[in-house]
Amino acid sequence: LNTKKEKTTLKEITLTTNGTLLKKYAKQLKLNGVNRINVSLDTINPEKYNKITRFGNIEKVFDGINEALDNNIKIKINTVVIKDFNENEIEELINWTSNKKIDLTFIEVMPMEETDISREYQFISLSDTFSKLDKIYNFSKIDYSTGGPARFYTSDLVSNKIGFISPLTNNFCASCN
């Protein structure tokens, strides 16, 4: 990575991970030019995490996030909002990430057309979720991008940016090139 960064005009090198090995590799990733790490984390509840990851240890993820932050790597949490699984944790996730000054992006469940698995039962409209959260946080839209389709907001009640990716209720392909 380090040699690639020196030969490119990239402003940022970003990596996406589940975070389980981040503690071990955070320092080396920073030394090799990684500026930001997106951590896929759909819950901060240990029991739910264990269930969704099939016996994963959320403490390893938390330790990895802390190690990355200690090495001055920006972190963004990506959370797929899943009906009857984590929809009741949204405010807790906002507060947890705000306390750590970590940006957070909520993502709608997307259909998996290449599989036989229907995910419609997991769907929650992020447009509806945003409306509910906006009543609490009074969001202000900001001109910020991480190179993807998320719409970002801030609030006087939080220290971080909150993003929303809504492929179904707000077709993000409308802004694709």
Language-model features, listed with the residues they occupy:
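Glycine-rich beta-alpha junction loops
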Residues: 81-85, 108-113, 169
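Short secondary-structure boundary segments
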Residues: 41, 108, 166
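Radical SAM/AdoMet-radical enzyme domain recognition
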Residues: 1-105
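Accessory C-terminal segments flanking Radical SAM cores
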Residues: 113-177
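Class I S-adenosyl-L-methionine
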Residues: 90-94, 110-119
